[in-house]
Amino acid sequence: MGIERGGSPRPIKSYITADSDGINWIKIGDVDKDGKYITNTKEKIKPTGIKKSREVYPGDFLLTNSMSFGRPYISKIYGCIHDGWLVLRNPDAVFDINFLYYLLSSNYLYNQFVIKASGSTVDNLNIDKVSSALICLPPLKEQTMIVNQIEKIIRLIQPFE
């Protein structure tokens, strides 16, 4: 699995477009805080902005890396991300995608990110900080069983929310 940082074409206002050939410009404001999936964007960029940004594809895993850092999302769309995101490529090579989502959503991993992100003016994550997080990696079959149990508990809790 590879981790890459997003990038922004500058000045961004020169790249924003309403044209039908525009590329989804995925921003942190496009996602719900407690959401799981990225399904649409409010803005698009011109195709010329692709080479100055980072393309993401359906199934890529996105992680916020600044300000409200450490929030995971699964992209359901093609688009480009700015430097406030990290993209985790090909996570399904080693992870059940839902297991990775719950792992990255856990207090266990978030607390590691808090420690790693502190020390600068603005708390943020980078590729090295995310890559150095300590995780337990059970076999894929066991990951799927864990996900099934988590989702069973979530279904029991949801009526009370």
Feature locations, PLM:
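Periplasmic-binding protein-like
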Residues: 109-112
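Sequence-specific dsDNA recognition surfaces
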Residues: 1-15, 29-58
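A short glycine-rich beta-alpha junction/loop motif
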Residues: 65, 79-86, 98, 118-140
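Non-catalytic DNA-recognition/assembly elements of restriction-modification systems
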Residues: 1-9, 132, 136-161
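A short beta-sheet element
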Residues: 27-28, 44-105
